[in-house]
Amino acid sequence: MKFFLATLFASAVSSIAVDRLIPGAQIIPESDTRALLRVGGHHDKYHDRRTITIRPSRNDTDDVSRDFLWGIKHANHGGRLLLKKGEKYVIGRKLDLTFLDDIEVQLDGELKFTDDVSYWQENNFYYDFQKSITFWRWGGKDIKIFGTGLLNGNGQRWYNEFAGQEILDPDNEYYRPILFLTENATRISVEGITQLNSPCWTNFFIQSKDVSFDDVYIHAFSTNKSALPKNSDGFDSLNVDGLTVTNTRVDVGDDCFSPKPNTTNIFVQNLLCNNTHGVSMGSIGQYPGVMDIIEHAYIENVTLLNGQNGARLKAWAGQDVGYGRINNITYKNIRIENTDAPVVLDQCYFDIEAAECAQYPSQVNVTNILFENISGTSSGKNGKVVADLVCSPNAVCSDIQLKNINLTSPAGSPPEIVCEGVQGDIGVECQASAD
């Protein structure tokens, strides 16, 4: 009798599991190692898990958003969603994935968003901060995304239609989606994948804790020379504690790494930035009456090539802006080549005339900053100046140190370091701004 009841129960459970499947999907238990290996649902860095597969898209218009959401829900609480190598999965509907708890997503294929601009302009997740929108949002705890695959923002149409516009223009109403966004996420990691052609910022982390990226390649390029990618930052953050980026390469045409307000405990190591606006702290201080901070950052072993800026601190100035501090930041072992402004403190951000900046200076304090072992060349665009540290008269800039700086300029020798309004000895000879 016991055997009969057990058999009946097992049969019922199996029947329920089959009934829950959608066409083209599969649920493989963690004990079935052969089946896991057959589909590629195995990774030596992570233990075997219940693995879910879904059907791939037949073409670039075959939206599998509902299948993807089904797969995420069934992989939640201890499972893994596998997106197979050689397959494409097209997402054409916004997805709220903020319910996650102990899940892995193995991205070995291509996950691609549609470029239906009219749909995404009306259907997205909107955030007031710099009028940000996204295709989807990820949240919850213990989330791992890994693999050898591609997350494709399909940005070319967005580049074409946004050409000549500016994201920070108060009249701008052409909002472009962020490729990957977390909100209220704790312990989320991304490893091994490529992120391609985000319409706007590539990654934006909001109200999250312990975010890590390792061995990721981020690239944004355009096939239209008159419509290049714009605002395609590699990494941005807002209200985040614990942000780590290691062994990563970024080629985007805007900020390589740029934590925004209230980001603390930052660690960056072994980062290569090509054709970017640099590794920036900020910008902060944008919104009237609001206090922002960036604090406790350690940036080490970074290479910056062919860019606008290298190591940069940036804060807003103007009549209606905020205040705050950038504190305890270390840039160490930084190699910079062919870069307009290798080391810069910019407290006249953004797009503000010198007269207005002088009338309404930044109120962001900059303290405990170390630039150590910085070497390479500028582009010569700013003459012989290789470091430009000009502090706002309405802010405190103190304990700023430059050690072992070996930067040269093709504009001539000796290279010049500008410092103005900085309290105390900065460790090297410097001169006042010529402006």
Swiss-Prot record:
Record lineage: Eukaryota, Fungi, Dikarya, Ascomycota, Pezizomycotina
Subcellular locations according to the entry: Secreted
Gene Ontology MF, one: galacturan 1,4-alpha-galacturonidase activity
Gene Ontology biological-process annotations: cell wall organization; pectin catabolic process
UniProt-recorded name of the protein: Probable exopolygalacturonase B
Signal peptide: 1-15
Protein family (similarity comment): Belongs to the glycosyl hydrolase 28 family.
Encoding gene (name): pgxB
List of catalytic residues: D254, H277
Keywords: Cell wall biogenesis/degradation, Disulfide bond, Glycoprotein, Glycosidase, Hydrolase, Repeat, Secreted, Signal
